[in-house]
Amino acid sequence: MCDPHLFSFEVTGHSCWHIVNLFEELTDEGEYYIDRENKKLYFIPNKDIAGSEIRLSVLDKVMVSVENAENIVFDGIPFENSRNSGIYIQGGESVIIKNCTFRNLGIMAIQIGMGAEPQPHGKNTCHGERAEGVPVPKPISREMGSWQEYLYEFAAWDNDGGHNHSIENCHIYNMGAGGVLLSGGNRKTLQHGNNRIFNCHIHDVNRLDRTYKPAIHIMGVGNKIAHCEIHDVTCMAINLHGNDHIIEYNRIHDVVTGSSDAGAIYMGRDMSEVGNVFRYNFIYHIHNPYKTGLGVCAIYLDDGCLYNSVYGNYFYDIVSDGQMFFTPIYWTQGGQTSIANNIYIDCLPSTNPNIGHNSFDKMHNDELIIRCVHTEDFDDIHGVDITSDLYREKYPYLYKTYTEDYAPGTCYWNNDVYINQYTHFKDKENLDFSFTDEQQKKRDEYLSPVRITDVVRGYEKERIPYEKIDFYSIGLLNKEKMYGKT
């Protein structure tokens, strides 16, 4: 038996736990027990395995490490059957991973950027507050460690993700603890990483670690996730930290299946993480698995999230019926995000924000927020300085919020459409929610340009026309040809 250790923040009525690798419980088909000391596998098959190959991986290191290298291509290679991750990238430029399959790995497929040394045994952090005895993060190479646990408090950390790396046309599934860590860029200097994940199919990535290990964790500045399909994830599809990221043309469904108080796409708790764009995505079939827990949603802009853009998206069948009412786009105690041009189909009402504080007040009186937005020491990775010339020029509205109590409260809403009548759409059975020609004509007539102010997207007292959304451009491209060698 292992030594006792901390396994949760607290135990509640809807908490889940299970025992792993206990020989005495080896009773049913499909179960197995690993005797690590003697390197033996005990397995009760659930079908005839005559002629089958059974593999027991002992590799506990990352399979391939690429550090400070340039112009390298991995094409059509399967990475499988390891207790660690597939590829680790640190620094460098233009490392391309394409047409590869990642499966049956113990941690994740690809890690771009350094991890953090594991926290002391039995210690934890929660919402940016470290338990006594937990040190500041120490970067480590070729390992994940406790990077996720530190990010709420140290979101200005540059973990050396390099530049112009690309993950393309890959199939990622059956991971132990998430899919991809996509880092790059520097939040102190706002230098973009320009790293991307493009046209990848990612699913079933929480075999071992079921919360806060999303299909994609994106951090840093100026990275992109586009044309991906993400599904069957027990927590978030995408967890975001940083600035100026673009999340576009993705199809996301059947995620947060083992979580509550969560979103298919999640960001928050740092008022300096602005300039991110969520556009032209199709998010659907998001349901609350635990009725006694809090809600779930499509896009979650959590505590203090400001000045990002959510436009041109389709939301279908987003249902949250937990103890707290969540809407498809849900923000709490923040605001001032541009929400426009979205279509909601068979969803609960999507405008029910939880506005619990004033942004100006929090920036000056909440210690955690102060460290995020006004850390003048360049070497202090607690946060950035939004009063610096660099941030003032890039995000003038953010500086005004800090100095003048500018536009506290709600988001900017315009041209959003809510429909529960499926007769308006071309082919609902195949989830094609493009409008019929007749309905499109009616909508063009009805949605005449309106006068609105939206500082995030640069509209000041201008008329904003409704922008048509090309449903057929969303999701994987050339799906039948993209998986590479299997």
Model-derived segments and spans:
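Extracellular parallel beta-helix/beta-solenoid repeat domains
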Residues: M1-T486
